[in-house]
A protein has these predicted regions:
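Charged docking surfaces used in two-component/phosphorelay signaling
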Residues: 24-32
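Acidic catalytic/metal-coordinating carboxylates
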Residues: 42-45, 68-72
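The feature encodes the CheY-like receiver
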Residues: 23, 65-66, 94
Length: 128
């Protein structure tokens, strides 16, 4: 499917992660599925880009410099009249963190390492 046609056309995803390898692998996979990808390397940059670019979905790492994924998620939920869809990714195994993310309104919570097909499936479900 071409990037400029079909249901994915114009769908923009903001990746917020401080790990360059993860950003690159996610970006390549999502672009291969026809999505436009924006990148932020820390929580503050992620919030600024989200406010300026109004993405359809945010993929958010939990542990980042300057502002954690939790703080970004909380701010996203408070500042937008229509909540943006958010997938939180983390290497953290703790169930308390997942419960807190769910309390803040995360749409999906995926633990690293994960198969790219699992992430793409979540993206497609949330953007359909």
């Amino acid at each position: 499917m071409a990037k400029d046609s079909g249901p994915k056309a114009g769908k923009r995803i903001l990746l917020v992660d401080d790990d360059a390898e993860i950003i690159e692998s996610l970006r390549l996979a999502l672009e291969a599925h026809g999505y436009t990808v924006l990148v932020a390397r820390d929580g503050n940059q992620g919030l600024a880009l989200s406010e300026r670019e109004n993405p359809d979905l945010v993929i958010l790492d939990m542990m980042m410099p300057k502002r954690s994924g939790f703080l970004v998620l909380e701010k996203l939920r408070r500042s937008r009249p229509v909540p943006v869809r958010v997938i939180m990714i983390t290497a953290n195994e703790g169930s308390r963190h997942k419960a807190y993310a769910e309390m803040l309104g995360v749409d999906d919570y995926i633990r690293k390492p994960f198969g790219m097909d699992k992430l793409v499936e979540s993206v497609e479900r949330l953007l359909s």
